[in-house]
């Protein structure tokens, strides 16, 4: 079996046929979604996979309609999941730039509907709600972008049941928003407005399909992605689903040569459940994931028209080497920089210590326009233009994909799987993950000064890296693979998880080693608050000590 043969087998025509077949309509816990899962079941079965379907309980939310008028003029708007419905909310409309929403005075926004810029984001809504705003309307791109307004990752628990925003939210296009801002300015800063929204939030059964190709070992690599969509969702995410189907077609005949198994796991609940599908699947299979899942390869938003930037895709320290190899082999990319995973991309498996690589592998170059401005406010200044002006809009149709770009991106994923399934030594570097954690802890120690002592943990991480490097030379490959997996089940949660490994942190930005984030606040706290924060931080150090001790035992066993 030659790796180049696997890459050469990727077929752009088949990929686009799969995309069109999967695009059964807007897929949001409805009949179109059922049809799409039926299509996927047939495609995976025809490819030669062992296919199972599950229905897992989850909380989802779908926008059912919205109306908005200001100063007697009606505007087309969309409302957003996980926000309350509003039946004719009447209030004055005011404009507040998005970079001032966190500092606006209550006098400025209280009891008013606030018009602001960018994609509909929960932190912005939360800041305005805390200041007494009655509702929020966002100015997005040339097309109105769908977003989910929630910090709750997956379905709520009793602890997070009341963490949703309590005011209605809508979005309008950049053109309408610009004209409305001009009218507000002419009117002296306020206009009478009326906002109505209908949002249906409910518990339902979230479908998950798993297509397995069994190799020589029960340990497995998984390729994951979401089926649900805004509009036809060709880019987001029929492209990622088609990637999974194409990889299954290519790999199934090679099962007897595979050293490890592969599972293609696709779910709903991403767009309208804030990752409720991946979260529910993790919860249902946690022990197996922790023990036997070697790698999570997330497949999302592939092959976009004009998507030529291939240097920024996410990876963990343990998978950066594999990412570089795959991008170089499959796409000739030699300047990949990558980035750390953010709290997004269905990354629901950190608590189980699963190494992850990729989500998208290609993005748009920076561009001018309203959509670019909106993406910039969401993703930061960045070095890309995101996923295109059609992302999360009704214009995300198959013509927004470039067949050659799609095949190129799928070849990158094919390279990842070729190495992960057929290499004698699994190309996941546990020592790199250990060393990155050590470096992050050194940075936290420098900030904390004498307030906290991480020296014992840092010394243990040095010993752990040395032990892994020594056993990598002496162990047989399979034994070392098992050893590394046990180490990563301890180290990855320390690097990425703030709370319990069995629950899921909020869908908000977090620093590396988030359990130590209070260090950044120590200097600004009162003595009483600082002492309380130090109690929490000392407990975090205990967690670091316990997990690194277990990891060192695993490395030396």
Predicted segments with their positions:
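Catalytic-core environment of secreted peptidases
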Residues: 9-33, 43-50, 112-118, 125, ...
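Acidic/histidine-rich catalytic neighborhood of metal-dependent amide-processing enzymes
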Residues: 122-123, 205, 229-318, 346, ...
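Second-shell loop/turn segments in exported
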Residues: 2-9, 23-31, 84, 95, ...
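Noncatalytic luminal/extracellular "stalk/propeptide" segments of secretory-pathway proteins
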Residues: 2-13, 17-110
